[in-house]
């Protein structure tokens, strides 16, 4: 990461969360190359996976996208208030009340209808609202069941159904038996409706053409998360994070670091304290496991991760490079969110959302 971008961030905060819009655009275009005539509907829920929903929305709009998925009504309204032309916003949570439907109608937001209760609520609204029907074909989370088709058809007007969707449960594990079963099920279901289809999430996109159908729904892949372990598919990480050194010290063999004395030095060790902690989304499960980087050199995080601070072993770094304010890479070119996920025992989504949420960002 160029020093000028880090310096730019320091006007706002010592911690640097940098979002590269060019890489986001690159990932969009890499996905576009793979899907032929199918259409991309970006998933920008979870504050665009921690990257900032408004800026990511605008960037993807400039890439040519006009349709977007969000999970919360307030996010859908926020996007509609941007007043960009010809956008469709699809609300994954659907509707829970007449009041919600009032907002859907006012802002022309299209809900995902997941069950008969939601369908009845939207049918009772005095103004017609177009929606998407979501069928459960194996996820067992949200969605109509196959057995409910007759009831659904009796409650729906064909012109109000924009398309039919389902969600793959095991695409990231490349469980082709399950994925093909779900694909066949949704095709069978759609034979009753004859509408456009959407089945592929990020991982589903990379399973092959048969899963693309009319619409694909990339989420994590837009932000550079590879759908399958250690396969890049040309995707680039969009988020980089840097934090400054606050202090350095040398401790003797046998001395300990941090709360609970969980780290004991096996030899004389140079330690740097970094202005970053779990209040910034750094997972405490990473203690004595994760690494950070100084000028491309790996340094172990040692001791417990504190609310605002982490301590690192910098014995391998020259003293001249350990000055106050020196930028330490938490996430970036040397360490992907996949690396951090492995080190902390979670998935890449949680890493990005945890680190990105509630942070001030610089967009480049």
Please identify what each model-predicted range represents.
Residues 30:
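Conserved N-terminal alpha-helix of the aminotransferase class I/II PLP-enzyme fold
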Residues 2-20, 25, 75, 95-96, ...:
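Active-site anion/phosphate-binding pocket segments in diverse small-molecule metabolic enzymes
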Residues 11, 15-19, 23-26, 36-188, ...:
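Active-site-proximal beta-alpha core segment in soluble small-molecule metabolic enzymes
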């Amino acid at each position: 990461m160029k020093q000028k971008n880090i310096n730019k961030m320091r006007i706002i905060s010592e911690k640097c969360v940098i979002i590269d819009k060019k890489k986001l655009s690159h990932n969009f275009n890499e996905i576009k190359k793979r899907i032929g005539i199918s259409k991309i509907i970006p998933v920008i829920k979870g504050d665009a996976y921690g990257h900032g929903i408004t800026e990511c929305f605008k960037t993807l709009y400039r890439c040519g996208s006009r349709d977007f998925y969000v999970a919360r009504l307030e996010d859908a309204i926020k996007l509609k208030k941007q007043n960009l032309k010809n956008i469709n916003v699809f609300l994954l949570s659907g509707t829970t009340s007449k009041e919600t439907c009032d907002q859907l109608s006012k802002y022309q937001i299209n809900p995902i209808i997941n069950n008969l209760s939601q369908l009845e609520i939207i049918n009772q609204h005095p103004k017609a609202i177009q929606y998407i029907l979501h069928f459960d074909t194996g996820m067992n989370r949200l969605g109509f069941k196959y057995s409910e088709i007759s009831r659904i058809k009796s409650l729906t007007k064909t012109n109000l159904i924009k398309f039919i969707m389902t969600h793959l449960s095991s695409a990231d594990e490349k469980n082709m038996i399950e994925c093909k079963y779900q694909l066949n099920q949704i095709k069978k279901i759609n034979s009753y409706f004859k509408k456009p289809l959407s089945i592929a999430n990020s991982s589903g996109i990379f399973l092959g053409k048969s899963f693309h159908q009319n619409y694909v729904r990339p989420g994590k892949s837009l932000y550079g998360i590879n759908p399958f372990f250690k396969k890049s598919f040309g995707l680039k990480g969009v988020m980089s994070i840097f934090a400054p050194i606050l202090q350095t010290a040398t401790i003797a063999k046998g001395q300990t670091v941090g709360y609970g004395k969980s780290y004991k030095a096996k030899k004389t060790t140079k330690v740097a304290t970094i202005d970053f902690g779990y209040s910034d989304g750094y997972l405490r499960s990473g203690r004595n496991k994760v690494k950070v980087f100084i000028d491309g050199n790996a340094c172990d995080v040692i001791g417990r991760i504190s609310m605002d601070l982490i301590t690192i072993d910098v014995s391998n770094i020259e003293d001249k490079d350990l000055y106050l304010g020196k930028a330490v890479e938490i996430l970036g070119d040397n360490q992907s969110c996949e690396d951090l996920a492995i080190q902390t025992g979670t998935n890449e989504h949680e890493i990005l959302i945890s680190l990105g949420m509630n942070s001030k960002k610089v967009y480049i």
